[in-house]
Amino acid sequence: MKKLPLFLLLLVCLLCCGKKKAVEELSPGHTVTIQAGDIKAVFADNTEFGVHRAWYNGVAFLSHKADTVNIFRPRVAGLNFEHIFDGQKWWEPAEVLFEPRACPMSIQRISDRTAELHQGPTSLHKLESWTRFTVTDPHYIDMEFTCIPRAETFDRGYIGLFWASYINTKVDKGYYFIGRKTVEDQKQWVEINSPAHNIESSVRYELDERDPGFVEGYPPRLFNNYMDYRYSYPFYYGRRGKMAWMLMFEQAGPVRFSHSPTSGAPVGPGTEPAWDFHYLFYDYKVGEKYGFKARLVYKPFVSREDIIEEYENWSGEKVEMP
């Protein structure tokens, strides 16, 4: 038997080694798995698979080399597009209350680092949206959300959108931001750890004086109950064990932070928190594009100075603390 020339052997070796192994999806057509840098993420549409429940679009799984356990509760998700609201209509049944979850949604892999969710005009508010997730070295998920209102259905002139992240922890339920009660006060680190679901559950920007308005009798929700403190910079972080989970946004004002100590359950032992946010787009016009960019950071916690540095490097803004 003839031996292959050395250069041919090297060529075969290079071709074999350079060939990427195909990712086996948890639910083909409904999930996109991306492993890059230090993190692994599974993005999902509204379809049920395995232990993962239907309606929980977003990031179904997120782990880090330093902690391979899912940061999110296994049956649900993080960065889950949960509510569309206008302050006027009160929703029932659940299919309307959780409109982005209940309406059809598709997912596709854009590249080896990017997945995109698409939802056609929804049943009640006729809002079409695209959510693009890109995994960036070494420990980031960049999120870009775009939406277009296809009809004049938001009765009070603004578009309200809400995202939930269900954290897999029973301790350290609060998260932290830099803020103050008034602009005359000194900035400080503040923890939001609301006493119960829908009580003192959201945080506004310190210069945000616009009131979206809710019709009289509108039930209490996470997005219409506020704590006294306001945030000074559009980022917050929480901790699970040795890990830090951080969200930062490109623009202060339209984004408001939200929190639930129990993810909607009654207060009690064994409950797990939700570290949420919502966006408000005022004076909307049918057919116009609206959106935002955000970055999720997931890595071992180093210090609060390191958290600030992450935000400064990404935003280009200098954080000033006393």
Task: Explain the meaning of each model-derived region.
Residues 2-9:
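Sec-dependent signal peptide recognition
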Residues 14-16:
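C-terminal motif of bacterial Sec signal peptides marking the signal peptidase cleavage site
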Residues 19-79:
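Beta-strand-rich N-terminal accessory domains
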Residues 22-37, 208-322:
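Beta-strand-rich recognition/accessory modules
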Residues 52-116:
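An extended acidic
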Residues 87-140, 147, 152-154:
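Extended, loop-rich substrate-binding clefts of extracytoplasmic carbohydrate-active enzymes
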Residues 140-194, 304:
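Acidic (Asp/Glu-rich), glycine- and aromatic
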Residues 174-221:
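Glycine-rich (often Gly-Gly/Gly-Pro-rich) flexible segments and glycine-rich loop motifs
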